[in-house]
Regions:
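Conserved, single-site charged/polar hotspot
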Residues: 1-256
């Protein structure tokens, strides 16, 4: 789930298999906390801010593909401008936020580029009065600590998404709810490469494909994954689950 909290009605329900339990790990008041439960529902609350907050970045270029954005990023770096690649909707190259971390520095950069004849870079500014805050309830206690790590004892975790795009899928490995660069959250599935390929190949080629085609697709999917682990460095994960990368649906619909 790449953009949990993009809509205030977004929900996620995580369910352990019968006879299994979920373990939730997070930090509260600088102390590690562990809870166990059969299921947990994550939801979004819009959290009012005590004072308006400026969310701003210098967008140097916009692209249809990661490859095009990466080429552009290399050109900006060659001019001495630290950058990062993002995907708020389309792919973009941003001036690195850690470096251009004040309104003055961002405006100095943009003015300098305009004086050099650049017309594409622009300042993406938004004043926020509230932000999405993910929360969950276990044993009648409400929590909103992040990141949140979720594991199951021995079985896959069932994940049901609510909101505008309801789905029900099964995932091996661990799940991690973490903030992303766009002000909402990403639910990351942490699995070994072989498990990842199980969730990709049937959905890229179809479940009725002949065995030689399945084997060839597995090689292609593995090669693609290993070559593209850097795509989402800005958000602290490696690959997305849709056609911008490879379609990945966990253990749902995998080969036996």
């Amino acid at each position: 789930v790449q953009r949990f909290g993009a809509q205030p009605t977004d929900t996620l329900t995580l369910q352990a298999a019968p006879g299994d339990r979920l373990t939730l790990q997070f930090t509260q008041q600088n102390q590690p906390q562990t809870l166990t439960t059969n299921s947990v529902k994550l939801e979004i609350q819009m959290q009012p801010l005590s004072e308006p907050m400026l969310q701003e970045r210098v967008v140097l270029s916009t692209h249809r593909s990661f490859e095009s954005a990466e080429d552009s990023a290399q050109r900006w770096r060659s001019q001495g401008i630290p950058v990062e690649i993002a995907q708020p909707s389309r792919w973009q190259v941003w001036a690195k936020r850690e470096v251009y971390n004040t309104p003055l520095l961002r405006r100095v950069l943009l003015t300098s580029l305009q004086k050099q004849g650049y017309v594409i870079p622009f300042l993406d500014s938004q004043v926020l009065k509230q932000v999405p805050q993910a929360a969950w309830i276990v044993n009648n206690t409400r929590y909103s600590n992040h990141p949140l790590q979720i594991t199951a004892g021995k079985s896959p975790i069932q994940v049901k998404t609510g909101g505008r795009d309801p789905r029900n899928r099964s995932y091996a490995g661990q799940l991690r709810l973490q903030r992303n660069a766009y002000g909402n959250y990403t639910l990351v599935n942490q699995v070994p490469l072989e498990t990842y390929l199980r969730g990709v190949v049937p959905h890229e080629i179809g479940q009725q494909a002949p065995q030689p085609a399945i084997e060839a697709q597995a090689i292609l999917a593995r090669t693609y994954a290993l070559r593209n682990l850097r795509r989402f460095q800005i958000d602290n994960y490696q690959l997305c689950a849709d056609t911008q990368c490879q379609v990945y649906e966990g253990l749902t619909g995998t080969y036996v």
